């Protein structure tokens, strides 16, 4: 007599088999473990930073009477660049005493909620002030003269020698008649950097009417950070992958050779760098659809640099009004996918 199973028992058997299958395959079907963030560094401001109610009109008046400039140190919790710059220049190092002698240093957290009365009399939260000042990298250093005018802003980490140039530029009030790059060029005699090649570099002299993603890298012979940029960032595999949508051009920011810039104007690399207001070498300006979409004016480690490239190359800047907003969403997505994120060098 043939063996048969009625419908009721068949359903029960299938349920048992499915339960057994889930038990055996559970690990494979389990949710992907979240990724981890490494490379963040906790930091604290030195105790000699000025205690402030963040009313910068009052701070300017005090600085004016003392004949000093104000240095606003804008940082972010667990920022490795902030920690390094504080350690090398404010907690110790040759710049420490120079800064203490000549500047009133006031800390502002770019994600903070404290109320700030800025030099123009307007009131902001710390976070809104960072947006107003277009802070795209931390630390950002904002220098204010005794008359209450912003005279220089540095977005991103600077090495101690590079920062020293900026400190002396402000203290000497050289900002009255020249740019920071011109000031450095006059002071620096012996070249610090020999230009390096890269397989992605193209020789371009006419940038007009170019509407695809374009990365223009400005370097010069006095660039203290350019060699490290090539070694640790520009040749990193993750960065090379995000460079694929870009046409990449390196220009000597001191060169006087004729070129046509992105707007169609006849100019030179020197004049173009000056018109862009670049304060750092290497200065990386990212263009798309014939206009500037983002720039990098401080040292970034490979993760943040490749995400800046993706921000423009993937045209995410069309969806997000700020890189920081894009980056927050991007990091959440990567961690959700189980990707580890390394903020370190």
Name these PLM-found stretches.
Residues 1-13:
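Positively charged n-region of N-terminal signal peptides that target proteins for export
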Residues 13-14, 57:
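Hydrophobic residues within membrane-embedded alpha helices
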Residues 102-103, 246:
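Short, well-ordered alpha-helix to beta-strand connector turns
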């Amino acid at each position: 007599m043939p063996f048969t199973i009625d419908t009721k028992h068949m359903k029960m058997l299938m349920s048992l088999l499915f339960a057994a299958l889930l038990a055996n395959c559970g690990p494979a079907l389990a949710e992907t473990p979240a990724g981890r963030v490494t490379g963040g560094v906790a930091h604290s401001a030195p105790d000699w930073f000025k205690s402030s109610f963040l009313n910068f009109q009052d701070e300017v008046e005090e600085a004016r009477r003392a004949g000093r400039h104000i240095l606003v140190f804008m940082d972010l919790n667990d920022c490795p660049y902030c920690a390094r710059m504080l350690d090398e220049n404010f907690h110790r190092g040759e710049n420490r005493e120079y800064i203490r002698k000549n500047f009133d240093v006031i800390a502002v957290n770019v994600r903070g909620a404290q109320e700030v009365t800025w030099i123009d009399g307007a009131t902001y939260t710390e976070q809104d002030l960072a947006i107003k000042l277009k802070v795209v990298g931390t630390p950002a250093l904002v220098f204010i003269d005794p008359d209450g005018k912003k005279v220089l802003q540095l977005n991103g980490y600077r090495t101690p020698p590079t920062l020293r140039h900026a400190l002396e530029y402000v203290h000497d009030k050289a900002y009255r008649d020249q740019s920071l790059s011109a000031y450095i060029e006059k002071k620096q005699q012996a070249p610090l950097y020999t230009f390096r090649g890269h397989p992605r570099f193209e020789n371009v002299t006419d940038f007009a009417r170019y509407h695809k993603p374009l990365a223009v890298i400005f370097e010069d012979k006095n660039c203290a950070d350019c060699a490290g940029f090539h070694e640790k960032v520009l040749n990193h595999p993750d960065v090379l992958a995000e460079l694929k949508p870009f046409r990449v051009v390196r220009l000597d920011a001191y060169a006087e050779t004729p070129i046509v810039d992105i707007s169609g104007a006849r100019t030179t690399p020197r004049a173009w760098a000056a018109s862009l207001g670049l304060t750092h070498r290497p200065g990386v300006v990212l263009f798309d659809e014939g206009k500037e979409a983002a720039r990098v004016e401080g040292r970034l480690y490979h993760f943040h640099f490749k995400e800046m490239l993706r921000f423009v190359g993937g045209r995410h800047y069309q969806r997000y009004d700020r890189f920081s907003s894009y980056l927050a969403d991007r990091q959440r997505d990567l961690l959700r996918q189980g990707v580890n994120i390394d903020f370190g060098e």
